């Protein structure tokens, strides 16, 4: 059975396959990131989001896979066979778990739409012949920023800028910090 773990999130395995394998951080770095950013939400008995649920399941599966790999490593007599198993797990399973964790962490951090836009942008960039594409690949953290191009001609009338709230004091941010839920 061929199951695409990204389907319900609007992405596909193919869409993530445009990103090279060395793009994804190590399992250790991803676990550290998840722990630093989402530990409370992942441990919470509340349902936070489908991304939290997917991360919980993927972390549990990785733990079970590491238990199995340890058992195989301890019980397989032939060193060549043991190395084959370890290399297979690290190369194939490790890449899949790194992709999965990166996707869900990125969706929680930047938003699903931004991540999908990034995947499409990167896919277009990587498939464009080098002579016709910009030298640098798109960067996920800069995607939400938009460039405003002014028309030529009359300059817009000048106004005194209105006082603005600092971002960190916005009501939305305050509300989310004061909520009792960890999500």
Curated annotation (Swiss-Prot):
InterPro entries: Hepatitis_core, Viral_capsid_core_dom_sf_HBV. It is found in: Virion; Host cytoplasm. The modification Phosphoserine is found at residues 155, 162, 170. Keywords: Capsid protein, Cytoplasmic inwards viral transport, DNA-binding, Host cytoplasm, Host-virus interaction, Microtubular inwards viral transport, Phosphoprotein, Repeat, RNA-binding, T=4 icosahedral capsid protein, Viral penetration into host nucleus, Virion, Virus entry into host cell. Phosphorylated by host SRPK1, SRPK2, and maybe protein kinase C or GAPDH. Phosphorylation is critical for pregenomic RNA packaging. Protein kinase C phosphorylation is stimulated by HBx protein and may play a role in transport of the viral genome to the nucleus at the late step during the viral replication cycle. Belongs to the orthohepadnavirus core antigen family. Self assembles to form an icosahedral capsid. Most capsids appear to be large particles with an icosahedral symmetry of T=4 and consist of 240 copies of capsid protein, though a fraction forms smaller T=3 particles consisting of 180 capsid proteins. Entering capsids are transported along microtubules to the nucleus. Phosphorylation of the capsid is thought to induce exposure of nuclear localization signal in the C-terminal portion of the capsid protein that allows binding to the nuclear pore complex via the importin (karyopherin-) alpha and beta. This is Capsid protein. It comes from Hepatitis B virus genotype B1 subtype adw (isolate Japan/pJDW233/1988) (HBV-B).
